[in-house]
């Protein structure tokens, strides 16, 4: 039996950066709080836990004072920073720069679309940490779309600025875009300035799909290892499964 490990497998650069930041702090203090799982990988979370990393949730945060807390790569809403300031919590911010850029884009887009009585649409997974952070930038005043069925919430007569969670499938994002265009065309609304689709997908993630398809096609069986809670992992596994039906998900 010949086994090949995909040379591109592993954590994304944002997660690697967060882990490195945690490790550096743990070398100094042997204890650090982390707001949510640093990565959707039980083995890695266990390893860091043994080094002194303690995972807390957002409800816990308000009960901590005068300490250090790591912000993971997913990013956070403004409310998290407000609590930290009020409780004298020092934040070690490992928010992914791609996510931070998207947060800024959504804030600016919200200002612009509000001037023309438009609406913000975010394509993403409900309850996902990144999505919570994105919606928090505009106090939740957006339409969250997880599937084509969710588009019924939209007012297609009004301008639309659309953004995507960074780890979603490019193919699925394109399908959402095309469906919105179709419905607007049916209403005879074709002004391109009133439907702005922002390319906010992470290049590292979106670039993995074609690589994985090639990798999957040249092997008899694919064993895909990922955390069950990883949106990125689920999306990439589906790419493998579509290319090679003998693909199996293990967490």
Model-identified regions with their sequence ranges:
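The feature marks the mature, well-folded catalytic cores of soluble enzymes
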Residues: 1-251
């Amino acid at each position: 039996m010949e086994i090949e490990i995909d040379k591109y497998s592993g954590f994304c650069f944002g997660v690697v950066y967060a882990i490195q930041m945690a490790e550096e702090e743990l070398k100094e203090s042997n204890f650090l709080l982390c707001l949510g799982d640093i990565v959707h990988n039980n083995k890695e979370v266990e390893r860091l836990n043994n080094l002194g990393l303690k995972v807390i949730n957002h409800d816990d945060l308000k009960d901590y004072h005068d300490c250090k807390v790591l912000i993971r790569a997913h990013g956070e809403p403004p409310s998290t920073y407000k609590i930290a300031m009020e409780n004298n919590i020092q934040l070690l911010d490992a928010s992914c720069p791609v996510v931070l850029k998207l947060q800024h884009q959504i804030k600016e887009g919200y200002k612009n679309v509000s001037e023309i009585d438009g609406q913000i649409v975010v394509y993403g997974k409900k309850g996902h940490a990144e999505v919570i952070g994105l919606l928090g930038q505009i106090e939740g005043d957006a339409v969250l779309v997880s599937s084509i069925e969710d588009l019924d919430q939209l007012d297609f007569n009004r301008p639309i600025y659309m953004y995507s969670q960074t780890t979603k499938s490019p193919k699925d994002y394109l399908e959402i875009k095309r469906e919105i265009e179709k419905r607007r065309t049916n209403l005879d609304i074709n002004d391109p300035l009133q439907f702005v689709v922002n390319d906010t997908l992470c290049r590292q993630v979106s670039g993995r799909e074609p690589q994985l398809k090639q990798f999957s096609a040249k092997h008899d069986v694919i064993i895909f290892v990922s955390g069950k809670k990883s949106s990125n992992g689920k999306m990439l596994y589906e790419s493998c499964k579509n290319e090679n039906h003998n693909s199996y998900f293990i967490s």
